[in-house]
C-alpha cells in the first residue's frame, strides 16, 4: 500500500496525478506516514469482515476488495475538501484508473490477509468500518 502510494504520488503512474495535503501529517517522499497504517488497518478490517462470510476464499477476497473500494469511492470526493489529498484539477476528481489500480493494489493485500487468516476481532472491524462509512457519508452532505 505505502509503496504504491510513494510511486503513485511521485510519478502519477499508478492512481493518476495527485498530491497529499497537510491534514494527514508527517510525510515521507511526499506520502503521509499514516497512509501505510491506513492501508494495513483498512485491509485488515475489510478482510476480517469478508472472511466471516461463509463463501469460498476467492469470493471472500473479492468482497474484501469491494469493501475497500466502497470506502475509497466515498472518501475521494471529500478528501480535497479537508486537504487530505487532491487529484490534478483538470481531471475533475479521481480518474477511473484510480479505482481500478486501487483494487489491483488491494487484491494481493486481501489475498495475503484472508489466505493467512490474519483476521481481527469482527465486532471491532464492523464498528471501524461502519464508523468510517458514517463519518465520510456525513461529510459528503456538509
Task: Specify the residue positions occupied by each region the protein language model found.
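Aromatic-rich, lipid-facing transmembrane alpha helices and their immediate juxtamembrane interface loops
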Residues: 1-142
